[in-house]
């Protein structure tokens, strides 16, 4: 069962006819697209990934380029969930990993409920179309609107890593799955754009409050045969927003590109 809490007073939220309500009568309407906004002061400017990044990621991932990694995440998630599981996808984006995880849990003969949290309303609008079985919230990974010790598993797939908050919402002995880029991930994309590309720095894996159970690596080479897919890959990464117009033109002019994918997946258990 997904146990949401009020972002104002931390009281338990109940779904009552199209809105979530806490005992102190703080009320949060459910949008037509199916998510509830639990981000305080969310009217003050744009939050999270913008429409260009979200659409680029959706278009790129829906073409199957990351399927090997998505399957690895889903299989690991299903392996480490109990028979009846509540899974939190912290930074769920447009929901492609969330859906794969739910399907893998069902395939393993288990039952899962999935809560997707993202700070981007645009991303959740797309996520709501993936499956009617998601519970979706606009919220920050740093302030999850989830009751203490109520989640069996947390997914952290290329989103802000906030271990103290993940430890708070996880049950004792629950699992955290964290994705991170390996040294050579997307090297050829960086070499296309930058004169002096750099390796990805190593990711520190020791995390207070958690025991590292194991790490897994997934590698692949994808071949992009049209400019549309090259631009989608570029625009779904932070590189696009850190690159000047002159270097962006290199991606805009490229017609084909082979790119190495190199993912790490760290599996932790809450102490």
Task: For each feature predicted by the language model, list its residue ranges.
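Conserved Class I S-adenosyl-L-methionine
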Residues: 218-271
